[in-house]
């Protein structure tokens, strides 16, 4: 236990929290340009072809972003918005593409959970 004099001379340092999304620089989203759009396979025991994009952000970071939903229109040089949120079975993928923003189209076949995929309300 430190004495009062020791604490006056050198106060206690606050614990530094490590962020899970360093490329966002404490921003909610970031804009970037796709440098490569490809599919990759998940870790065991899952099996699929997950759609991901390599993105060069406006702050200079280059990150891998997951493209959620069925089908997408992204290609190289597409301008997209990314948000935080990792994909548990894809190592190194810590970001998600925001559907329905900038060059990334929404999923037009969505009926439920539409807001997460940038889908408009159907005409019923």
Swiss-Prot record:
The keyword Iron-sulfur does not apply. Part of the 30S ribosomal subunit. Contacts proteins S8 and S17. May interact with IF1 in the 30S initiation complex. Pfam families: Ribosom_S12_S23. Belongs to the universal ribosomal protein uS12 family. With S4 and S5 plays an important role in translational accuracy. This is Small ribosomal subunit protein uS12. The gene is rpsL. It comes from Shewanella denitrificans (strain OS217 / ATCC BAA-1090 / DSM 15013). GO terms for molecular function: rRNA binding; structural constituent of ribosome; tRNA binding. GO terms for cellular component: small ribosomal subunit.
